[in-house]
């Protein structure tokens, strides 16, 4: 009995002194494992006299239970201490400055496009859309560009092998709109167009807005009034404007619109901003509208051109280089 008590006291002291889980596991094996000290005492019960076995067995069981409880408690203590140490090392310093979320914004071309569409919406124009991959009929023939007409060369077209093409203007949307609606009608088409051209003021892909009005009594004076109001609303100031005769196959007469633009040095020069004209009778006929009864006017503008003027950008290519330093100015 005294031997078991002495063994238990030494073992409890060793358990309390264990500093790591590995040390504690080694003690458990040495005490309670198959070859452990307490297990050996149990195996020796059969060698004791019968009158001593009961008391010795009870003492050994009490010792085993005490050691098992001590091992479990010490294991929990060591695990808690290890967790506290790890958490202390991973503690977040709440006094550190936070990471600022970057503020985004619309691309300047998108902002300009939305501004143009909103102005024409106030004037009663409905926004319509169409495919960027067009057929020859909607992009050229219906707009008074017969096959082999030299005016087609002005468009620097991207063709596919099956005869389809990347639209060179949004005028094809006007043809589709007139096919689906009866006069009177008033619409604008906005989106990407493609031409094989690239320099400081041209891009192979750019954005265009075109407008169309067809009614029984529309005339060139209505066209001038509409565009004058648009230019004033877009730039938020009045400009001296002039309409120069020009050629576009789908209008007759056709004109280009210039505004008197003030230079940084204070001088003024004429700056082209729009193309326009009265819808050609052949275009109306191609969509089943009687040109003897209805007349109309059309106009078109490059969105990047207006964005360059509005934001003072000299090189159109800056809009497509994705330079965050440049784009952040407009966020």
Curated annotation (Swiss-Prot):
Binds 2 magnesium ions per tetramer. It catalyses: tRNA(Phe) + L-phenylalanine + ATP = L-phenylalanyl-tRNA(Phe) + AMP + diphosphate + H(+). GO terms for cellular component: cytoplasm. It comes from the Bacteria. GO terms for molecular function: ATP binding; magnesium ion binding; phenylalanine-tRNA ligase activity; tRNA binding. Tetramer of two alpha and two beta subunits. Belongs to the class-II aminoacyl-tRNA synthetase family. Phe-tRNA synthetase alpha subunit type 1 subfamily. This is Phenylalanine--tRNA ligase alpha subunit. It comes from Xanthomonas axonopodis pv. citri (strain 306). The gene is pheS.
